[in-house]
UniProtKB/Swiss-Prot annotation:
UniProt name for this protein: Probable cell division protein WhiA
Purpose of the protein: Involved in cell division and chromosome segregation.
Biological-process GO terms, alphabetical: cell division; regulation of sporulation
Gene designation: whiA
Similarity section: Belongs to the WhiA family.
Length: 315
């Protein structure tokens, strides 16, 4: 089961206050429902691939309306051939859709009533229903952080975005295929949203994974930085050793001033050491990092003069 499925499973098991559960049902029907006309009557079908969500829609309809509904299971004939589930109402559709403020004079309303936004508990329930209907969230272990909710209508998408940003979630919106999405990219905000809609266990799991992942990334950055520094030291050390060997072959290390001799011998004997550590190995030391660097530069200059065939005044 995917992480998103785990989140939705937890949400379908959540007990919601009677006064707020209708807001969740409103979102589920508005975003997953479709209307057809049979015998001059509206028939409402709410479709989902998640059996737990289908059962929740069925229970909520039964909880609020004294109307018989049916739960239909069908099988896709393409691709994965998964089951999908339809909750269908053949009677009372008009009354239910009007009560849920989805239908007005036989027209589908694309937006949520403005007065609805004044009730914090209902907003949270509506967002929970919206996520159950068309939401998705990436697995925090394997993917980039991303949570989104899809809307068919732009006005409705704007409302979803506004609802989420009431809680400082920094939600953004964009057009996607034949509709629109509101999405979150920040790990902290995704965790806040999961908590907001009641997915507490999923939020805690998300946070645990995020902490481990961030720690792993931090360790990797440190290791990469240290590796880069070691590579830099190794490259510089190789160049210094090549130059010292050239000086020894053409002139002789023993012909160098004592300070340069000490550094040359120390570097040849300890090619892997940093400048700081090298300074502590000098017989007359310890020598500061800048002091060692200065002497090695002198040796490099001598080697370059030898390569250029110039006279070496420092000898």
């Amino acid at each position: 089961m995917s992480y998103a499925s785990d989140v939705k499973k937890e949400l379908t098991m959540l007990e919601v206050h009677f006064g707020n559960a209708k807001a969740e049902l409103m979102a589920l029907i508005r975003m997953n429902g479709s209307l057809s006309i049979v015998n001059k009557q509206f028939v409402l079908s709410v479709q989902t691939e998640n059996p737990a969500i289908a059962r929740r829609i069925y229970r909520l309809l039964k909880q609020f309306y004294d109307i018989e509904s049916e739960l239909i299971v069908r099988r896709k004939m393409k691709l994965k051939k998964n089951n999908f589930y339809i909750v269908r109402l053949k009677t009372g559709t008009n009354e239910i859709l009007k009560d849920l403020d989805i239908l007005d004079n036989f027209q589908i309303k694309e937006t949520v009533p403005l007065e609805f936004l004044d009730d914090d508990a209902k907003v949270r329930s509506y967002l929970r229903g919206a996520f159950l209907a068309t939401g998705s969230v990436n697995n925090p272990e394997t993917s980039r952080y991303h949570l989104e909710i899809y809307s068919l209508y732009e006005d409705h998408n704007d409302t979803i975005c506004e609802m989420m940003n009431r809680y400082g979630l920094n939600a953004r919106k964009t057009e996607r295929r034949s509709g629109y999405i509101t999405y979150l990219k920040e790990a902290e905000k995704i965790a806040d949203f999961l908590s907001l809609i009641g997915a507490t266990n999923a939020m805690l799991k998300f946070e645990d994974i995020r902490i481990v992942r961030d720690m792993r990334n931090s360790v990797n950055r440190i290791v990469n930085c240290e590796t880069a520094n070691l590579n830099k030291i190794a490259d510089a050390s190789k160049k210094q050793i090549d130059n010292i060997k050239l000086i020894d072959a053409k002139v002789g290390i023993d012909k160098l001033p004592q300070k340069l001799q000490e550094v040359a011998i120390a570097r040849l004997g300890h090619p892997e050491e940093s400048l700081k550590n090298l300074g502590e190995l000098i017989p007359g030391g310890p020598i500061s990092k800048s002091g060692i660097n200065h002497r090695l530069r002198k040796l490099n200059e001598i080697a370059e003069k030898i390569r250029a065939g110039e006279s070496i005044a420092v000898l």
